Amino acid sequence: MPKRLLQGVVISSKADKTVTVKVERKFKHPIYKKFVKVSKKYAAHDSENKYQEGDKVSIIESRPISKTKTWVVVNGE
């Protein structure tokens, strides 16, 4: 099964080797037919501590690194 790849924005980089990435997605509500924007936060591993708040990054699924980290930052802009 392929690993999932998501794009988002770093909203916190205070922890050591960890960034919090906010991923937004849009979908059409099945009843009201309105586009709804939903966001979710992921804790991702950043081994070099090189990403700061506001950076756009891509994260990929990986083995569990800690209790909450199962994503790794692969590249950013």
Swiss-Prot record:
CDD domains per record: Ribosomal_uS17
InterPro entries the record matches: NA-bd_OB-fold, Ribosomal_uS17, Ribosomal_uS17_bact/chlr, Ribosomal_uS17_CS
Gene Ontology BP terms: translation
Keyword Transport: no
Pfam families membership: Ribosomal_S17
A single GO molecular function term of this UniProt record: rRNA binding
Gene3D superfamilies on file: Nucleic acid-binding proteins
Presence of the UniProt keyword rRNA-binding in the record: yes
Cellular component annotations (GO), alphabetically ordered: cytosolic small ribosomal subunit
Sorted UniProt keywords: Ribonucleoprotein, Ribosomal protein, RNA-binding, rRNA-binding
Signal peptide residues on this chain, from the entry's feature table: none
NCBIfam families for the chain: PRK05610.1, uS17_bact
PANTHER family per the UniProt record, alphabetical: 40S RIBOSOMAL PROTEIN S11 FAMILY MEMBER, SMALL RIBOSOMAL SUBUNIT PROTEIN US17M
Family membership: Belongs to the universal ribosomal protein uS17 family.
Assembly and oligomerization: Part of the 30S ribosomal subunit.
Cited function: One of the primary rRNA binding proteins, it binds specifically to the 5'-end of 16S ribosomal RNA.
Protein name as it appears in the record: Small ribosomal subunit protein uS17
Gene that encodes it: rpsQ
